[in-house]
């Protein structure tokens, strides 16, 4: 019995699970500093992320020979590095696996690069689903719990 005590203590000290699917309000709060970046509203971003990943930070989608990762569905063809697509341009200079956690700061930095280079229509859901009638994407819960995002704002330079 005594040899199981350390294992038991280790298990209860770890979180039971890591959340990967978030609510509209959690995502909206976590990315609120993106509001207005390159003229894109928070409501547009909230809508795009719903239609892109379903607010799932661990979403992985195979698409035309490449793979898209995380909440923003960032492609390994151009933006991040993965072993399955070694010829990637890796414009964001990051491993694609970094987009599969709940730490969104690196996802946001890369998303800002994508928007600066390609525009919001890089995310195919934007034009048909997120360019008008956006009130449904408003979050009415003040103080919704934030995902792990260090202080960023729309003025944060994109490296």
Swiss-Prot record:
Protein name: Alpha-lactalbumin
Disulfide pairings: 25-139, 47-130, 80-96, 92-110
Subunit structure: Lactose synthase (LS) is a heterodimer of a catalytic component, beta1,4-galactosyltransferase (beta4Gal-T1) and a regulatory component, alpha-lactalbumin (LA).
Tissue: Mammary gland specific. Secreted in milk.
Record GO biological process: defense response to Gram-negative bacterium; defense response to Gram-positive bacterium; lactose biosynthetic process
SMART domains for the chain: LYZ1 (SM00263)
Function, in words: Regulatory subunit of lactose synthase, changes the substrate specificity of galactosyltransferase in the mammary gland making glucose a good acceptor substrate for this enzyme. This enables LS to synthesize lactose, the major carbohydrate component of milk. In other tissues, galactosyltransferase transfers galactose onto the N-acetylglucosamine of the oligosaccharide chains in glycoproteins.
Domain spans labelled C-type lysozyme: 20-142
GO cellular component: extracellular region; protein-containing complex
Major location category of this protein: secreted
Matching Gene3D superfamilies: 1.10.530.10
Glycosylation sites: 64
Keywords, comma-separated and alphabetical: Calcium, Disulfide bond, Glycoprotein, Lactose biosynthesis, Metal-binding, Milk protein, Secreted, Signal
Listed InterPro entries: Glyco_hydro_22, Glyco_hydro_22_CS, Lactalbumin, Lysozyme-like_dom_sf
Molecular function terms, GO-annotated: calcium ion binding; lactose synthase activity; lysozyme activity
Subcellular location: Secreted
Stored Pfam families: Lys (PF00062)
Keyword Glycoprotein: yes
SUPFAM superfamilies cross-referenced by the UniProt entry: Lysozyme-like
Amino-acid positions noted as binding Ca(2+) in the UniProt annotation, renumbered to this chain: 98, 101, 106-107
């Amino acid at each position: 019995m005594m040899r199981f005590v350390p294992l038991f203590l280790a298990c209860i000290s770890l979180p039971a699970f890591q959340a990967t699917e978030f609510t509209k309000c959690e995502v909206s709060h976590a990315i609120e500093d993106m509001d207005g970046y390159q003229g894109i509203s928070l409501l547009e971003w909230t809508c795009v992320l719903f239609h892109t990943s379903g607010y799932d930070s661990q979403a992985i989608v195979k698409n035309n020979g490449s793979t898209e990762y995380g909440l923003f569905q960032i492609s390994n063809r151009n933006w991040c590095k993965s072993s399955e697509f070694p010829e990637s341009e890796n414009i964001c200079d990051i491993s694609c696996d970094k987009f599969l956690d709940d730490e969104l700061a690196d996802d946001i930095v890369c998303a800002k690069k994508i928007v600066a280079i390609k525009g919001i229509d890089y995310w195919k859901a934007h034009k048909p689903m997120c360019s008008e009638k956006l009130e449904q994407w408003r979050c009415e819960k003040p103080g919704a719990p934030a995902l792990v995002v260090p202080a960023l704002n729309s003025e944060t330079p994109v490296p």
